Amino acid sequence: YTSDNQYASSAKAEHDALAYFIATSNCDAIDGGIVVFSAGNDALNRAGYPGAFRDYISVTSFSPDFLPASYTNYGPGCNISAPGGDAYIASNMTATVLSTMPSEVNDGSDYGYMQGTSMACPHVSGVAALGLSYALKQGKHYTRNEFISMLLTSVNDMERYLDGTKNSNGTMYLENYRKKLGTGAVDAYQLLMQIEGTPCLKVGVGAEELVPLTQFFGGSASRR
């Protein structure tokens, strides 16, 4: 698919089912459903569908070195990033993700090492589920858009690492990924603190940050 309209018309049954899910409230903490998809593993400068659709969250992948995975899609349609593994940066499978998988695929075991944005995607859906569970415990309720905004801002910055090159299945020019991996690397702790109402700030070593206190304490706050 190359556009939202093409996806919505060509995959109508899927689109309509997900639209129903989005519009239906099944949890007291939120007024609708959240759809999370992988961005794709083609190293393309755009998210693949269905994840690229405007109402869904599309997840890119970074490897254990906190840099983009060699295969991840990036660019338009991508919303947030999470660990997905990258076998090319290590001599064995330690740089990939231990995942559940059909036992008949892996010599009778229910687990195997894999990589991909499909490994990254469950990190984000899991963090979202954890956040909604905590919101229920806290007696909080959010609109769908409010919660998605909180999720997409509960991230660690990746931009300062996107400089130079990385050797992973070829040479990757990291500047090509700037502002294209989504808002950053998903952080469960930051989401829980947002739900709790506790300010949670992270600043890089040697960096300076100007923090407006009104963002956390209202218009009457003053710096001391």
Give the role of each language-model region.
Residues 1-55, 65-67, 104-123:
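Substrate-binding/access-modulating region of protease and related hydrolase catalytic domains
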Residues 26-35, 54-58, 78, 146, ...:
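Loop/turn elements at helix/coil->beta-strand transitions in domains of secreted/extracellular proteins
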Residues 197-224:
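Extracellular ectodomain surface segments
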Residues 62:
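Carbohydrate-associated surface elements
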Residues 85-86, 90-181:
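Hydrolase catalytic cores
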Residues 26, 40, 185-200:
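Secreted peptidase-domain scaffold signal
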